[in-house]
UniProtKB/Swiss-Prot annotation:
It comes from the Bacteria. GO terms for biological process: translation. It comes from Mycoplasmoides gallisepticum (strain R(low / passage 15 / clone 2)) (Mycoplasma gallisepticum). PROSITE patterns: RIBOSOMAL_S2_2. The lineage of its organism: Bacteria, Bacillati, Mycoplasmatota, Mycoplasmoidales, Mycoplasmoidaceae. This is Small ribosomal subunit protein uS2. Belongs to the universal ribosomal protein uS2 family. NCBIfam families: rpsB_bact (TIGR01011).
Amino acid sequence: MFLFEDLNVESAQAVKAEESPAQTVQSKEEQVPANSTDKVLVTHTKLLDVGAFNGVAKRKWNPKMKHYIIPRNAAQFSAQFDLINSDLLNLKLHEAFNYLTEAAKAKKNILFVGTKSKAVQELIQSIAERTNSFYINQRWLGGTLTNFKTISNSINQLKRLIHTRDNDLTKYTKKEQIMIMKKLAKLERFFGGIKDMQGLPHVLVIDDPIKEKNAVTEARKLRIPVIALCNTNSDPNVITLPIPANNYNIRSVTLLLNLLGDAVALAQGNPAKFAFKPDEEIDIPQLVKKETRTVVNRDRAGFNKKQPKAEEAAKPAEKKAEK
C-alpha cells in the first residue's frame, strides 16, 4: 500500500494487520483536529443512531476486515451481522478528516465518487457542490484517470457545447439544436462534475470501494490516495485510508460523507453541515420506500369484458321459445 506523498501526514499510513486495537486507540488523541478541543467531531450516539457500526451478514464478511470487527466470541456478538469496532471507526474517521483538511488548505483536487444508487448520486453531487470539489456520480468510465487525455477531449467538447448553447444556438436548425442538446445532456451527465478539474485529482473519496472497484484500481495504478467507507465485506488493503463503517445504510453514508465534506468546507472558511455539532442539530431523515402497488390485469380479471345488452340477451331466449 502506498503512502500519501503530497502531504506529510503520518496518519496516512495503513493500519498493519498485526497492530492490536488497543495500540491503535492509544494514538486516537493525536488524530483529533486542533479545532476540536472543545467539541467532538461526531458523537458515538449519533453514529449508533444511523447504524454506522453495523456490518454485513457474517457469511459475507471479508477476513481482511477482521482487525476492524468486534471479535466473534464476544458476549454481545449474537447478531447475524458483524459489528464494527467503534474506536477504530472514530480513529480512521479523524485521520481522514485531518488529511482532507490539509488537502483542502493546499488547494488539492478532491474527487468524490459514488454511483451506487440515486440517493448516493444526489448526496455525492450535493457534497461536492457545497465544498467546491469535483464529483462523479454516474457510471465510472474506463480510463477516467489512466486515460485522462482522452477524457479531457470529451470535457473540452462539453465546454464547447455549453458555449454554443449559451451563445450561438439560434443559428442552427431545429433538428440540429435537438441533436446538440442531446449530446450536451449526455456529456454533462458523465463529465459535468469534473469539467472544471485541472489535471488529475490528488485524492479520491469513495462511498463503496466494491461498487467503485474500477475507480480504486485506476487510482492505485497512478498512486492517487483513496479514502473509502469500507464495510465488513471490503478489502481494506487496497484502500489508502479505509474508514470501517456501514456503507449500505444511506443515513450512515450521509453522515460520514458529509463529515468528510465538512473537513474541506471548514478548511475553505465555509460553515460545516454536521461536524462538531450537537446531535439535535444533525437531522438525517429516514429514506421512506414507496409502497409497491399490485397491478391487476383487468382483462384477465374480467373487468373489461363487454356485458351483453338486454335486447341481445333476450334474442337467444326468444329463439328457444319459437322452437
